[in-house]
């Protein structure tokens, strides 16, 4: 859904470790947070509002997917629209759709590269926008590769496409978060990556949001103090290929969720679906991948969730999650397309979709017991 971006609403958010001493005294809007307690919400007098949020996993363009984008775009230049289009019916209906750009953008003439460099073409931003994404997290363990130039190129391309970037910046006083007004609701999107697994940009440690749990709570509190009614956190963290969150992941998200500062945590980083958990009313959903072309013998890395969470306003003005649903999406490297594991007729369900559902249902079982709805293939 398209929305009204709030160009100047919040002061820059950064973890204490990511900030450098300012050359002059800070203004009140830039002062350091001293309390991690969210401000009380005012009592709501008008009709109670709702917001549906779509969250999905990593977009990581390998050379084979780049080849499909070149073929799809033809003489008009590379296009990623067709590669992402399979998930559009899940993304477009949401009020606010969140994606994760795992790699930075190279210049248009530069190569799309494989591990360990991982750059992609800025045309990806257009594809992201056209399938319905409103904001993208950009903080990951690959953000630093092209330095400030690459961060600027990535964020500029997303903004030009109408997508709000979050998680990285080229100047220390710029915002690290995205702030948008959606259906009259002010939404802040914070993106961060695990500092233990994500190198800082040389000479610019403030460029990527590498905050700890305490730092992220402070950022969320600051966002609320500056007017955000809903705060969404995208967190890149986890062990690659693991089907379960690590102890560090669990500790981090538990502390953040219990703080009451955020409404939803969208996790990615392991490249596999790792389940979900509702902690003190806050859903934490580890999404897996959206679009990628990983190892052929690793089917779990070609699966992801597109989750839809309904946040409903309460009489006190706060928002709580009342519904959560996940749809399984398969990345098909050979065709360069996405397939949703959901059909009107069971005769249409493929063996691959049945396998993906069985594996995902096992991982999601605790979340299903908490009320999470996993869409069946038919």
Would you name each region that the model predicts?
Residues 1-7:
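Sec-dependent signal peptide recognition
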Residues 10-12:
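C-terminal motif of bacterial Sec signal peptides marking the signal peptidase cleavage site
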Residues 14-17:
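Bacterial signal peptide processing site
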Residues 22-378:
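Acidic, metal/ion-coordinating pockets
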């Amino acid at each position: 859904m398209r929305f009204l971006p709030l160009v100047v609403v919040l002061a820059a958010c950064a973890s204490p470790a990511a900030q450098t001493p300012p050359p002059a005294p800070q203004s009140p809007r830039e002062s350091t947070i001293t309390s991690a307690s969210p401000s009380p919400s005012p009592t709501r007098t008008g009709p109670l509002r709702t917001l549906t949020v779509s969250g999905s996993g990593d977009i990581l363009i390998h050379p084979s997917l780049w080849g499909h984008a070149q073929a799809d775009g033809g003489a008009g230049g590379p296009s990623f629209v067709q590669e992402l289009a399979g998930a559009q019916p899940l993304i477009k209906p949401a009020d606010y759709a969140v994606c994760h750009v795992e790699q930075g953008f190279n210049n248009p003439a530069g190569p799309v590269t494989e591990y360990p460099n991982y750059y992609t073409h800025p045309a990806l931003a257009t594809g992201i926008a056209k399938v319905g994404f409103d904001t993208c997290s950009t903080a990951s363990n690959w953000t630093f590769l092209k330095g400030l130039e690459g961060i600027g190129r990535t964020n500029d391309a997303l903004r030009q496409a109408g997508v709000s970037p979050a998680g990285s910046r080229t100047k220390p006083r710029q915002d690290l978060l995205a702030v948008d007004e959606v259906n009259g609701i002010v939404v802040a999107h914070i993106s961060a990556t695990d500092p233990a697994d994500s190198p800082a940009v040389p000479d610019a440690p403030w460029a990527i949001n590498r905050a700890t749990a305490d730092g992220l709570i402070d950022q969320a509190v600051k966002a609320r103090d500056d007017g955000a009614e809903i705060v969404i956190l995208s967190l890149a963290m986890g062990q690659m290929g693991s089907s379960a969150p690590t102890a560090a992941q669990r500790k981090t998200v538990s502390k953040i969720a219990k703080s009451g500062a955020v409404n939803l945590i969208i996790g990615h980083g392991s490249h596999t679906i790792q389940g979900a958990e509702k902690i003190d009313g806050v859903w934490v959903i580890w999404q897996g991948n959206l679009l990628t072309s990983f190892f052929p013998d690793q089917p779990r890395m070609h699966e992801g969730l597109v989750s839809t969470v309904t946040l409903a306003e309460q009489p006190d003005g706060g928002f709580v999650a009342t519904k959560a649903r996940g749809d399984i999406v398969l990345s098909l490297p050979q065709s360069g397309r996405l397939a949703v594991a959901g059909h009107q007729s069971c005769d249409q369900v493929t063996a691959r979709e049945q396998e993906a559902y069985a594996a995902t249902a096992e991982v999601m079982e605790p979340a299903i017991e908490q009320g999470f709805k996993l869409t069946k293939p038919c």
